Amino acid sequence: MKAFSPVRSVRKSSLTEHSLGIARSKAPVDEPMSLLYNMNDCYSKLKELVPSIPPNKKVSKMEILQHVIDYILDLQLTLDSHPTLVSLHHHHLSRVGGNTSRTPLTALNTDISILSLQAVELSSEFTDESKSLCP
């Protein structure tokens, strides 16, 4: 007898059910898998909603979260720069001492990736030079 994994049907209403507070009773064994499927559905929904994620590109969950954070912060900056809210925002910043300029996480990760690649290239150059020094 072969082992098989259950086929899960794609449900578009999973988020709607959660927002309405509708709960189904599940056996304790099914709950971890159900939770995993719900989390994957949530990541898929986030990927659809954030405009900076290319729709046909495969991205990790970490990248999705980074894009979501960037998107939320960009929306906050846009909202904060709205003319009617600027005075309220400045009043709030003077109380908490905040700063509105920021570097997106995706840009920081790109910079780190570039530095990592440069370090690998540099170490390979040193290795090549050390080989030529040894007879």
Curated annotation (Swiss-Prot):
Superkingdom assignment: Eukaryota
Pfam families: HLH
Keyword presence, Ion transport: no
GO BP, sorted A to Z: cellular senescence; circadian regulation of gene expression; embryonic digestive tract morphogenesis; endodermal digestive tract morphogenesis; negative regulation of gene expression; negative regulation of transcription by RNA polymerase II; neuron differentiation; neuron fate commitment
Molecular function terms, GO-annotated: bHLH transcription factor binding; protein dimerization activity; transcription corepressor activity
Cellular component annotations (GO), alphabetically ordered: cytoplasm; nucleus; protein-containing complex
InterPro entries: bHLH_dom (IPR011598), DNA-bd_prot-inh (IPR026052), HLH_DNA-bd_sf (IPR036638)
Motif extent (Nuclear export signal): 108-117
Keyword entries, A-Z: Biological rhythms, Cytoplasm, Developmental protein, Nucleus, Repressor, Transcription, Transcription regulation
Locations listed in the record: Cytoplasm; Nucleus
SUPFAM superfamilies per the UniProt record, alphabetical: HLH, helix-loop-helix DNA-binding domain
bHLH domain segment(s): 23-75
Assembly behavior: Heterodimer with other HLH proteins.
Role according to the record: Transcriptional regulator (lacking a basic DNA binding domain) which negatively regulates the basic helix-loop-helix (bHLH) transcription factors by forming heterodimers and inhibiting their DNA binding and transcriptional activity. Inhibits the activity of both neurogenic (neurod1/neuroD) and myogenic (myod1/myoD) bHLH factors. May play a role in the regulation of the circadian clock.
Name of the protein in question: DNA-binding protein inhibitor ID-2-B
Lineage: Eukaryota, Metazoa, Chordata, Craniata, Vertebrata
